[in-house]
Each structure stands twice: as structure tokens, then as C-alpha cells.
Amino acid sequence: MPELPEVRVVCKSLNEKVQNLVFKKVEIFNPKLFKEYDPSYFQEFLIGEKILKISNLGKNIIYFLTNNKIMLSHLRMEGKYSFYEQKPKETLKHIQAIFYFENGSELHYRESRPFGTFHIRYLNNYLKIDPLAKVAQSPGEIDFETFYNRLSKKALAIKPTLLDQSIVSGIGNIYADEILFASKIHPATPSNLLSKDKVKEILKNAIEILDKSTELGGSSINSYESLNKKEGQYQNFLKVHTKKGEFCIKCSSKIEKIKFKGRGTYFCPTCQKQKDFI
């Protein structure tokens, strides 16, 4: 699933291509992705509106449109966008929707496993109702005391706590492993047993890792691509995630993988000993 860096990269690429373009037509091939309303209403809602800017809240892509309209997009497991200046001679597989613009360009949304979602909202309510109502700020936005207080109330292990988008947004399986390795924290450590210094370390490392990944275009693991099939490079700098059996860059112990709370979790058993965390 694309995480914060990947979504940021997609938003940047979309802004470069579709900002200030006006919707002319919308073709919806998979109505299940377009939530709450009939596809015809989605089309009516969008046609004639200009895209003012594209931003994100955590893993959610936010299209800000004229007339105080909002379109939300979540890529879920492997959603992807492709932009064309003019109608392509051939379309890629698994197209779920096509957005046509008045200047003749097209934005295609594709997904081989269609779990992505689209919602339409208005500026005055999009943060007050689902799917964004409970989404927290990202590590670079949240203040330390808020983050610490949320963790101090959670007896749950730190790995699934970091994945909870109501605690802090944008962190998924890849970056949770990397952040905990950088912080020398075992993924099973109860969140409420972490000292303030350790929580500060988590937040600092989260910001640094997510920012660096964003600079490098995200991590192209499995199927991630940003706009027009462009791959990221941060996967070449991962320290533990996907590194089972490889030697730790810090201590030369072998990286282990466990199934934890339903997630494949990578860590160094030497650098991330539980007794060192509290």
C-alpha cells in the first residue's frame, strides 16, 4: 500500500499535470470505487469544475476544486494514475475510471485489485465526516505532546500503534519497520511503556525517513509507481524491511521476519532488544 512518501509524490506529480485543468467528462468503469453516490452524480459534481490544487492528509489524496468542491482519492493497495496530453493510442489494463479535461488531456485511474476509493465532499465538511474525520496529522505536522499523550494511553504494541491512522497518519508497514529500527525499538514493545525520550526519537526518525523517501520518489516495492509508471528509489535504502536473512548494517546480526498482528514485520534481534526500549 502506498504510504505517506508515495502519496506525497503522486500529489506533486498530479499538481504538475492537472492543476488548473477543467473536468469535461468522467467515465466510471467500476462504480464500486465511487462511494455513497450514484456514478452519474459523481460525473455531474465534477464536470465544469477546475482543479485548484491537490494535497493530502496522510494517505488520502485531496483534490480542491472550484465552487468549494472536494474529491477524495485513496489508492489502497495499488491504485495508480496515468496522465496523457491527448487520447492515448492504447490504454493500460485495469482502468477503473478516466477523467477527461477540456484541453483534451486525460487522467486514468487503474488498479488490478480494485480496492481504491473516491468520495465527493464540500470544503465546509470534508474534515468533519468520514473518511477523513478521524485521520490524524502526519509525523511532520503533529506536535510532540499530542503524539506522546496518544502513545502513553495505548497498551498496544508500538508497531500496530504507528499504523493506526487516528494516532498519526501516513505510516504503513514499510516505514513502521524502518522507523522502529532507526529508534532501536522492538515492534512488540507496549506503546505506553516508552519514555518521552524514546517517543521523541520515534518522531524524529519518522520525519527524517519519510522526508528522505519523499525526496527519492518513495519505495517501489511490489507494484508502487507514481504518475505514468515512474518508480521510486527509496527501496534501495531500506535497512530492515524485506531484508529477512540479510546482515544488519549496524551489528551484522541477521534480520528476522515475524508475523505480528497480521503484518509481516522485519527487525534486528540484536539492535532491537525489548529490554533496551523502556
UniProtKB/Swiss-Prot annotation:
Cystine crosslinks: none
GO molecular function list: 8-oxo-7,8-dihydroguanine DNA N-glycosylase activity; class I DNA-(apurinic or apyrimidinic site) endonuclease activity; damaged DNA binding; zinc ion binding
Record's keyword annotation contains Kinase: no
CDD domains named in the record: EcFpg-like_N
Binding site for DNA: H94, R113, K154
Cofactors, names only: Zn(2+)
EC number per UniProt: 3.2.2.23, 4.2.99.18
Entry's Gene Ontology BP terms: base-excision repair
InterPro entries (alphabetical): DNA_glyclase/AP_lyase_DNA-bd, DNA_glyclase_Znf_dom_DNA_BS, Formamido-pyr_DNA_Glyclase, FPG_cat, MutM-like_N-ter, Ribosomal_uS13-like_H2TH, Znf_DNA_glyclase/AP_lyase, Znf_FPG/IleRS
UniProtKB keywords: DNA damage, DNA repair, DNA-binding, Glycosidase, Hydrolase, Lyase, Metal-binding, Multifunctional enzyme, Zinc, Zinc-finger
The UniProt record lists the keyword Ubl conjugation: no
Active site: P2 (schiff-base intermediate with dna), E3 (proton donor), K59 (proton donor), R263 (proton donor)
Note on how the cofactor is bound: Binds 1 zinc ion per subunit.
Zinc finger (FPG-type): 239-273
Reactions that this protein is recorded to catalyse: Hydrolysis of DNA containing ring-opened 7-methylguanine residues, releasing 2,6-diamino-4-hydroxy-5-(N-methyl)formamidopyrimidine; 2'-deoxyribonucleotide-(2'-deoxyribose 5'-phosphate)-2'-deoxyribonucleotide-DNA = a 3'-end 2'-deoxyribonucleotide-(2,3-dehydro-2,3-deoxyribose 5'-phosphate)-DNA + a 5'-end 5'-phospho-2'-deoxyribonucleoside-DNA + H(+)
Family according to the record: Belongs to the FPG family.
Subunit structure comment from the entry: Monomer.
The protein's role, per its UniProt record: Involved in base excision repair of DNA damaged by oxidation or by mutagenic agents. Acts as a DNA glycosylase that recognizes and removes damaged bases. Has a preference for oxidized purines, such as 7,8-dihydro-8-oxoguanine (8-oxoG). Has AP (apurinic/apyrimidinic) lyase activity and introduces nicks in the DNA strand. Cleaves the DNA backbone by beta-delta elimination to generate a single-strand break at the site of the removed base with both 3'- and 5'-phosphates.
Name of the featured protein: Formamidopyrimidine-DNA glycosylase
Gene: mutM
